[in-house]
Regions:
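Positively charged n-region of N-terminal signal peptides that target proteins for export
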Residues: 1-7, 11
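Terminal presequence/propeptide segments associated with secretion/organelle targeting
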Residues: 2-4, 16, 23-733
Length: 733
């Protein structure tokens, strides 16, 4: 069985027995918990082998939580006092791509800075966030709201209160604050994060290490991806965040994670901390069916067509292929996840399971609820309105699917919003957001080619024309260019020039309306339609925000009455999950995991992408230069491993820690059968995939010779005597 790669029969038999035991004892480790909830889980954490006091885990100022950080869309952690950060290779891909040229291809060859002076700028989108304060502000957001307000009026009042809370929090400009909703608007927490703006690329292995197996192995196991990279946070000499500058110095992180090369075995407990993006476990059956039958099939078809267009438009041009490498990688990841969701819904009728849960809840609510049947009727109507509007929003997405047009629309909206007092501007267009807008408009140059963008827009307009007329925003058709004219429209625009694009920042609406640039003219022409759609969304959301919190209060009470876990859906805020190292059975007669090894790289390697491992890595495997990273039972180096931890998108790069809080791996994926966990957690098949620290350290030592980083980190190596004793006793993985 490839997963184990064990040369001796008796070792294979012993491992299978251990795996069988692990399968039978794997527990339902459901929950993406807010840190302050962890003291309620003392017994569960103890059962999982976590020895860190729960009260300590709840304290963001103490180790290990103070070492957990966020990147845009990803998670990471400090691993040295000098701001060294470890995350996934795919999370650092934008920084790698930004510094890559056809002559100096860091995507293909990898990159290692032997000195601090050699570290490369991560670019305007590579930001680091350190959460240092979380406070419950539910009362300040919701108390005293007039129950008779319309949906739009309620939405606007809640937004006004949230903006005031954010402004109050951001008096120190080193911090970025937000007030996200939890439990679908039932609770609000104000979160303060130190925002570090100078983040540099330190080390990334070759793409054929970090992304070995590519999209073929994405969401699959066993796999052998070394999905890791290192960044470094820099600040001004006063220790405060500063714009990128050669005068900046490494950030002195208060805490950092030690790295354990001592290894794990099946059944060992792990703790995982990061910033999961979004789950939908409290959605109603109607919402599940909408996603299953409408949203996901349309998304899969659109992304498939978009990827085909990008491939055709960049073919034969290495520079264009590099420009769109990150875009294609991201789209492929979303596509495979979407198809996995569709397959998962086909394999297991989650909507029917939710029907049964919903029926049981409504029966309980009839006896215990305070809102009566009117609340549930209101809820069903609000959900129906939300789904109907979502169809039009999807059509709008196709009608405006041009990166250059999106930039023009940003400029038009910014000009309009800047006519208002700052507190009255739309969120995202306030003074606090100007640096982000400029960075976003600048960043376009990394992944933009006029001919490619024009081809993508032409294909998107053709897709839009095939959407049912009832699902297209009223009046939009007459405002759009013909699909046949999209390429010429993009080619004729001056916005493709970064300097000219940025020069429009701060211009008045009249100047934009007077522009002869065809893309700006299209953005101006469609602005009223965009505003109308946004206004309708605010009204729908306001109605949902009025009804759903009361519904969620009842659902929480119902779940607690059954002794079931109650945690909020993921929303890109700091969460903690726990689990055990465990295999799983995706189908009858097949047991997978929990470890893959470097032997699998030799078996899969074809010399052709995506199974084209570097020669120096292959030679190190053949020479068995495994050293202290050799597992005593596997007799080789583990690459990736499985656990029962509860994860989702955004958890990429999350620190996987052992029971005492040492880093033992990085989360980067989940199994294909697990993808529907965003909607329904099935403990039997839900497995997260992590890269093993031992493989990371082995690649750094034996393949890329990143000795400077190995010296910088605090690494707990296994004691030779202990390893020998364990091997003699036959203790396995």
């Amino acid at each position: 069985m490839k997963t184990f790669a064990i040369p001796a029969y008796h070792r294979l038999a012993a491992t299978v027995l251990l795996l069988s035991a692990a399968v039978s004892t794997a527990r339902a480790d459901e929950g993406q918990w807010q840190p302050h909830q962890l003291p309620q889980l003392k017994s569960e954490l103890k059962r999982a082998g976590i020895t860190i006091p729960a009260a300590r885990l709840a304290d963001l100022s103490k180790h290990p939580m103070s070492a957990i950080v966020a990147l845009p869309g990803c998670s990471a952690s400090f691993v040295s006092p000098d701001g060294l950060v470890v995350t996934n290779h795919h999370c650092a891909y934008g920084a790698i791509q930004r510094n890559t040229t056809p002559q100096r291809n860091y995507i293909v060859d990898g990159f290692l800075a032997q000195t601090r002076a050699q570290e490369l700028p991560g670019g305007p989108n590579t930001l680091l966030y350190v959460t240092d304060r979380v406070e419950n502000v539910t009362g300040r957001v919701l108390d005293g709201l007039d129950a008779t307000l319309s949906g739009r009026a309620r939405h606007d009042e809640v937004e006004r209160r949230i903006k005031a809370l954010v402004a109050e929090c951001e008096t120190d400009k080193a911090y970025r604050c937000a007030v996200p909703a939890f439990h679908r608007g039932g609770e609000y927490y104000r979160i303060r994060q130190l925002m570090i703006r100078d983040v540099r690329l330190v080390y990334a292995p070759a793409d054929s290490v970090g992304n070995f197996g590519g999209d073929i192995d994405n969401y699959e196991f066993p796999r052998q991806a070394g999905d890791f990279a290192f960044l470094r946070a820099y600040v001004g000499r006063d220790g405060r965040p500063a714009d990128p500058s050669p005068d900046n110095v490494p950030y002195r992180s208060k805490d950092f994670l030690a790295v354990s090369a001592e290894g794990l075995k099946a059944g060992d407990g792990i703790l995982l901390a990061g910033y999961p993006g979004r789950t939908s476990r409290y959605r109603l059956p109607a919402e599940i069916r909408f996603a299953r039958d409408v949203e996901y099939p349309a998304r899969a078809a659109s992304i498939t067509a978009d990827l085909e267009t990008i491939a055709a438009a960049t073919a034969g041009n290495p520079e264009h292929e590099v420009r769109y490498a990150s875009v294609a990688k991201s789209l492929n990841n979303v596509l495979k996840k979407t198809r996995g969701l569709m397959d998962g819904f086909a394999r297991k009728d989650i909507a029917a399971l939710k029907d049964a849960q919903d029926a049981a809840f409504r029966t309980w609510y009839a006896a215990h609820g305070s809102g009566g049947p009117a609340l549930l009727a209101e809820l069903d109507a609000a959900i129906a309105a939300d789904m109907a509007l979502s169809r039009e929003e999807a059509a709008w997405g196709e009608a405006t699917h041009s990166d250059l047009l999106k930039s023009a629309r940003t400029l038009v909206r910014l000009a309009i919003e800047r006519q208002k007092p700052d507190a009255e501007r739309e969120a995202g267009y306030q003074e606090r957001d100007l640096a982000f807008i400029k960075a976003r408009l600048t960043r376009l140059e990394q992944s933009f080619v006029p001919a490619v963008d024009g081809a993508r827009y032409a294909a998107a307009l053709a897709r839009y024309a095939r959407i049912d007329a009832a699902a297209r925003p009223a009046g939009l058709d007459a405002l759009l260019p013909p699909a046949t004219g999209a390429k010429a429209l993009v080619a004729a625009s001056e916005l493709g020039d970064t300097a000219k694009r940025l020069a429009w920042i701060g211009r008045a609406p009249e100047a934009l309306r007077a522009s002869t640039d065809p893309v700006i003219r299209l953005a101006v022409r469609t602005q009223d339609a965009a505003q109308a759609l946004e206004d309708r969304r605010k009204d729908v959301d306001g109605n949902l925000e009025r009804i759903i919190p009361r519904y969620m209060d009842a659902v929480i009470a119902w779940k607690r009455a059954q002794g079931k876990p109650v945690y909020p859906d993921a929303n890109s805020t700091l969460r903690v999950s726990y689990g055990t190292v465990a295999p799983y059975t995706p189908r009858d007669g097949l047991v997978k995991g929990p470890f893959s090894t470097v032997q699998g790289i030799l078996e899969k390697n074809t010399g052709k992408e995506p199974f084209n491992a570097p020669d120096k890595l292959l030679q190190a495997i053949r020479d068995e230069r495994f050293g202290v990273f050799r597992d005593p039972l596997l007799r080789t180096v583990p690459v990736d491993f499985l656990s029962t931890a509860d994860t989702t998108g955004g958890n990429s790069g999350s620190a996987v820690m052992n029971g005492r809080g040492d880093l033992v791996g990085l989360n980067f994926d989940s199994t294909y059968e697990s993808i529907t966990k965003d909607w329904y957690f099935d403990s039997a098949i839900t497995r997260a995939i992590h890269v093993d620290v031992r493989y990371m350290l082995w690649v750094m030592k034996e393949v890329d010779h990143a000795d400077n980083l190995l010296r910088e980190m605090t690494i707990r190596y296994p004691k030779p005597v202990q390893r020998q004793k364990r091997a003699a006793r036959g203790v396995g993985r």
